């Protein structure tokens, strides 16, 4: 690892989308630890794919709620696509759980890790979610996103965000996503 290496931790890693993108963009990025756990299934398929592609070193396949922050190495950049089911068009907005939903609450694990890292928290963050995050919950549109932004500000982060549609970048699908940097 060179002096100019950007050490990355990837939460809610799936099959490694952030890692593929970052490490493909520059040799400066090195993913040193990642976590992928799917609580609703016995088969941890995404974790198995991740390990098959990148190896087991630094890979955690356990419930993020149970991972002590001390087990997560210090890093420069925290990335993650925190679970979107409670914001997704797959459920009606009026029935989506948002930040209080079954998986929406996992946002607070990101906050916990950043908060508990204290002076060793990463300098940079990069998160992704569906665009409906901006309007959640239905009865208080925008509340959840405002809570997320305020939580990051309370930790000392200056945050920018954008909604980006993959179709505008030549992808053969309309896939609007919210990015928080």
Task: Please identify what each model-predicted range represents.
Residues 1-181:
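Conserved active-site and SAM-binding loop architecture
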């Amino acid at each position: 690892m060179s002096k100019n290496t950007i050490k990355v931790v990837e939460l809610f890693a799936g099959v490694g989308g952030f890692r593929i993108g970052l490490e493909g963009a520059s040799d400066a990025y090195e993913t040193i630890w990642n976590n992928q756990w799917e609580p609703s299934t016995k088969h941890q398929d995404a974790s198995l794919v991740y390990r098959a592609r990148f190896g087991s070193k630094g890979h955690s396949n356990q419930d993020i709620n149970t991972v002590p922050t001390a087990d997560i190495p210090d890093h420069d950049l925290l990335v993650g696509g925190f679970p979107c089911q409670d914001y997704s068009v797959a459920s009606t907005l009026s029935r989506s759980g948002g930040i209080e939903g079954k998986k929406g609450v996992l946002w607070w694990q990101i906050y916990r890790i950043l908060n508990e890292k204290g002076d060793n928290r990463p300098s940079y963050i990069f998160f992704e979610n569906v665009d409906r995050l901006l309007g959640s919950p239905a009865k208080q549109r925008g509340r959840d996103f405002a809570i997320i932004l305020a939580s990051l500000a309370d930790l000392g982060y200056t945050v920018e965000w954008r909604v980006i549609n993959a179709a505008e970048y030549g992808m053969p699908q309309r896939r609007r996503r919210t990015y928080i940097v």
